[in-house]
């Protein structure tokens, strides 16, 4: 690549009657890169290996199972160029080392009872180990998280109903390298949801949903959402949507990562609370073609607004430490995005 990088990947897929498989593997490397000659890395040096095999079992015409594994190993080193080149001294001594392992399993089960009814189960388990090092400080920890979902789908001519249950778990154990307070945590979230897709008319489709999550120590979150798709002409359409969301507090934020989590106090369940978000978006899409369909043109314009209540911010304390506090008030973000696409035949 132009940034002194190398990307190599391979893919294989095959089906043998009732058994199928796909295998994806990649290797990514970046050499130390300092295009402005500042003496510090603009892109750190790293090596990354990814391996992703999947197995598909077609048990019957109506029942399928898939099992997958995703493994990733990465070593990353940034900081002073001379240090990275092995020429470090008292002047050239700053570095940031990241050693990461992320492994996850994926399991899906689907069974169709008839043309209208279907049962699905999904499960994923993720193991994430990280070691961060800077001069005179190191952070190590292991995070194990799981996600499970059971859903039932019923389809009619113009409507589709989906109802289900969710279970999330998230456990973090810090490798205690100093006498600083441990930042270990263990979270479990139970959820139930129902959603409906309705083809109201030829020009209007409505998608509505309601999710309720119970988060121990933080209470219940009720999360409605709605989306309406308007087909104004054969070439011009629009979508209007909105919904609620939330995030549980953890020490893993962008601000705390910039400090390598050094001197960041653990989350206090008695003081912290859920960050709650409220969003609204609208987009307009125009599609046309020229030259007997050989040339296609599309443009999409998106506008969005997000309101975040009681945001979690990193604040310094009087004794030189840092605490993540839910501040009183809100932050909001708004903006737009334009995408233009021109295609020629299959390009």
Language-model features: locations:
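Flexible loop and strand-edge segments within Gram-negative outer membrane beta-barrel domains
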Residues: 30-49, 56-119, 125-143
